[in-house]
Amino acid sequence: MVLKDFDKNLEKYAKLLVSTGINVQPGHTVNIVIDVDQAPLARLLVKEAYAHGASEVIVSWADDFVGRERLLHAAEDRISNVPEYRVAEMNYLLEKKASRLNVRSADPDAFAGVSAERLQKSTKALSLALKPLRTATQANKVSWTVASAAGKEWAKKVFPNAATDEEAVDLLWDQIFKTCRVYADDPVAAWKEHEEKLDAKASILNKEQFVKLHYTAPGTDLTLGMPKNHVWESAGSINAQGEHFIANMPTEEVFSAPDFRVAEGYVSSTKPLSYNGNIIEGIKVTFKDGQITEVSAEKGDKVMKDLVFENNGARGLGEVALVSDPSPISQSGITFFNTLFDENASNHLAIGSAYATSVKGGENFETEEELREAGLNRADVHVDFMIGGPEMNVDGIREDGTVVPIFRNGDWAI
């Protein structure tokens, strides 16, 4: 590694993820999901979590190679079922109210060439088996943070013209540190200032309580309904124990959930989507009566269609997020082939399940039917795809029909 002060900045990054991301408190159980190639960062995270008083730190190792070999060669009945020990681990983490830190560094093409049918079977089985964990996460019952680390294959995809693999990894780490404000003299203070700016936009939108949003851009003319008493959130969240955490690092978004029963028109993607080890590009989606009626992709069409039509609830939307086109990630001009980064360069929507916190009091609803009645989609998946750009306009429509500009030419107008 030749990146200047890399070890120092990696340690700062670990401290930031633990203290400001999942905000580890004395007595917490912590679950870190991380790739085997990122062991040095994992060890720093474990050390830092215990330094903050964690009672237990559990590391769940991931490996693209192992995952690919399983999908290619494992017996069919093993692909479509989840081992009991995975469910037992999930139940243990839920019982302990474990904070979850997911550090992603996967190869965007890890599962390219794998049978779409086998991939879909595996994804669906895992989604169903781990649904209680997803439900708890989407209701902020626990603290959770998604972050990234520079994996070699991912770095080579983002920086194909780098002279060496090491240079590509350095370039990607540099972007991770920049966008996560690690280079600031005081990263924690820098994040607090950033949160305040995003909170100001969320506050305006929450006061307005628009009944509809109207998106227009080349290839897009889409109207979405908004639930009654919807809530716009930004960087920071509060878990069921009253503890602050940041779900995504980096983040530039202000987000809520649309009413899944009201969506009319069409929308086109503006960035590639990395989903299940496949790259999907040129996505076009048509909505009628709140549901996706048609979907296509120039690349990854089969994977995209399976995502929408083979997963329960995936024909509806679960998230609407506003991101200024002049955001630092967008202005970098880099396509990261990683949703965590690319969604923070662009307005985006999410296919599938909504966060319970997107309506007032939703985190306290006890049944999925209550959430549906409030307009929140329930599904087995939640997958963001990017639709924003410098030509996008977004209008808010009040109950009396008044149209209020929210975005003009890809930037905030409120």
Predicted features and spans:
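Active-site bordering "gate/hinge" segments
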Residues: 1-264, 396, 402-404, 412-414
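Glycine-rich, charged/polar anion/phosphate-binding loops
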Residues: 130-132, 198-200, 209-211, 251-254, ...
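A short, compositionally biased
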Residues: 205-211, 279-281, 386-393
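Short linear motifs in exposed loops
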Residues: 225, 295-296, 407
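Long, well-ordered mid-to-C-terminal structural blocks that present hydrophobic/aromatic surfaces
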Residues: 256-312
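A structural signal for short secondary-structure junctions
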Residues: 260-261, 276-278, 286-287, 311-315, ...
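Dual-mode signal for accessory low-complexity, basic/Gly-rich regions
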Residues: 292-363
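Extended hydrophobic packing segments that form well-structured cores
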Residues: 368-414
